[in-house]
């Protein structure tokens, strides 16, 4: 059972505070009113059971249908066969505009409340979106800040970046067969992951940051420098580091450096990784 708050929006559920003068000259302030909804299921479409979103339609008998179901039903109410999809249910729409629900990541620390139906928009940028530990066999999930602390205390492998003039430099050394190298940027409390994908044409190298796409995290670009024993140098500059909640085992389709097999120096791969924080506009 989930409790949600009905609050005023567009003048619907919650009354305005107003000052009213009484007969004796004193002002009386009306208290705001709110209500608690204990069952979110009543805000679901009775046909597809998905969350109702504006516009909401009703037939002549008052049966509800969401905008997605109406064309699928050929505008025929499944409950009474009356036409549906032409009459808006303004009462339900006003309720939807007034319902505030807690973030689904409240147990991780998020205190935000979101208007019903807009949860997914908030979750994409929520600072508390759960991130998965990239260490194989570890099932830990938590906010990106908690994940950093978890990794630092529990695993503590890989090197730590050193920074100069806002740029973090990491000497990344890994076996290609390991496929993944986890690096820490202490100043930002962030984990960056270097991944290798060995293919017939060479080794793909990509870098990602384990964090949500939240403004608080910031944006980063990265550069890779690879030098062979013979002195041949390859460089790659990515305009933006991809932020992920969980590391993928799929070869990247973009933002990668491809090192041909002819330039590899055995099973060990050594690179210089530079991470630069982009200035927010």
Swiss-Prot record:
Coiled coil: none
Membrane-spanning segments: none
GO terms for biological process, alphabetical: protein ubiquitination
Annotated region (SBD), positions in chain: 95-280
Pathway note: Protein modification; protein ubiquitination
Disordered, as annotated region: 1-26
Binding site for Zn(2+) 2: 133, 138, 150, 155
Zinc fingers, RING-type class: 45-81
Keyword Zinc-finger appears in the UniProt entry: yes
Reactions performed catalytically: S-ubiquitinyl-[E2 ubiquitin-conjugating enzyme]-L-cysteine + [acceptor protein]-L-lysine = [E2 ubiquitin-conjugating enzyme]-L-cysteine + N(6)-ubiquitinyl-[acceptor protein]-L-lysine
Positions bound to Zn(2+) 1: 103, 110, 122, 126
Family: Belongs to the SINA (Seven in absentia) family.
Role summary: E3 ubiquitin-protein ligase that mediates ubiquitination and subsequent proteasomal degradation of target proteins. E3 ubiquitin ligases accept ubiquitin from an E2 ubiquitin-conjugating enzyme in the form of a thioester and then directly transfers the ubiquitin to targeted substrates. It probably triggers the ubiquitin-mediated degradation of different substrates.
PANTHER family named in the record: E3 UBIQUITIN-PROTEIN LIGASE SINA-LIKE 4, E3 UBIQUITIN-PROTEIN LIGASE SINA-LIKE 7-RELATED
Protein known as: Putative E3 ubiquitin-protein ligase SINA-like 6
Lineage: Eukaryota, Viridiplantae, Streptophyta, Embryophyta, Tracheophyta
């Amino acid at each position: 059972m989930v409790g949600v708050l009905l609050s005023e929006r567009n003048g619907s559920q919650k009354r305005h505070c107003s000052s009213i003068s009484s007969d004796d000259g004193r002002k009386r302030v009306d208290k705001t009113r709110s209500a608690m909804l204990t069952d979110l299921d009543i805000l679901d479409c009775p046909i597809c059971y998905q969350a109702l979103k504006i516009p909401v339609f009703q037939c002549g008998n008052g049966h509800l249908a969401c905008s997605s179901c109406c064309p699928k039903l050929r505008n025929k109410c499944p409950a009474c066969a009356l036409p549906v999809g032409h009459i808006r249910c303004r009462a339900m729409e006003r309720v939807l505009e007034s319902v505030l629900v807690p973030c689904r990541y409240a147990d991780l620390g998020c205190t935000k409340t979101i208007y019903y139906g807009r949860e997914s928009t908030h979750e994409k940028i929520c600072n508390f979106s759960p991130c998965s530990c990239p260490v194989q066999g570890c099932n830990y999930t938590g906010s990106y800040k908690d994940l950093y602390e978890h990794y630092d205390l529990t695993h503590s492998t890989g090197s730590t970046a050193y920074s100069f003039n806002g740029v973090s430099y990491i000497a990344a050394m890994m076996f290609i067969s390991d496929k993944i190298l986890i690096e820490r940027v202490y100043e930002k409390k962030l984990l960056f992951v270097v991944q290798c994908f060995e293919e017939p044409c060479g080794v793909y190298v990509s870098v990602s940051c384990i964090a949500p796409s939240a403004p608080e995290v910031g944006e980063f670009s990265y550069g890779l420098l690879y030098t062979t024993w013979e002195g041949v140098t390859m460089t790659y500059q990515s305009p933006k580091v991809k932020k992920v909640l969980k590391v993928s085992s799929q070869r990247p389709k973009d933002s990668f450096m491809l090192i041909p097999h002819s330039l590899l120096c055995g099973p060990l791969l050594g690179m210089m990784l530079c991470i630069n924080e982009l200035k927010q506009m």
